[in-house]
Amino acid sequence: MAGARGAARFRPGAGGPALGLPLSELRDQRVDLADLHPALARLLPGTLDLKTAAGRVLDVAGRLTADGPADNAVAHVSRMLGDPRARAEDVAGEVGISTRQLRRRCHDTVGYGPKTLQRVLRFRRFVSRIDAGDVDLAAIAADVGYSDQAHLTRECAEMAGLTPAVLARLRGAG
């Protein structure tokens, strides 16, 4: 498995505490596990058969999530930002922190600010709908919080580098 690559996805608020550093430092980068967590990297030596590698990856994932608790405030914030009408100022007030603190905590635990988190969550809702076989792009756009289908198209191009129709086709919908 020399040169093999993998990725980790954390639920909002869990990545920073699990890795022990602000995720904003890792955004848009490929980082070697040995640079982040040498002890865990040693669990994944160079050449493994696929079954052993999969077991070790699951072990590493379990250790990463066990290393530190998620920022529960950010987890709550991500649920609130799932509402496309939510505003950062209102969410911060609901959680009992300033808007500036909200931005900092989001950057540290998620890797980007609340507005970008809201965009990502909206895009994930769109992808979930097309994965479920929904092909009415205009209806999906309205349902998940885009102002119109053109807004969905711009955001899809930015997030995935594809039009919504092409993304749906590649994911098996439509």
Residue spans of the language-model regions?
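DNA major-groove recognition helix of helix-turn-helix
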Residues: 106, 118, 155-157, 168
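Short, hydrophobic/aromatic alpha-helical segments in well-folded domains
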Residues: 76-77, 126, 152-155
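Alpha-helical bundle regulatory/interaction domains
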Residues: 1-99, 109-114, 128-132, 136-147, ...
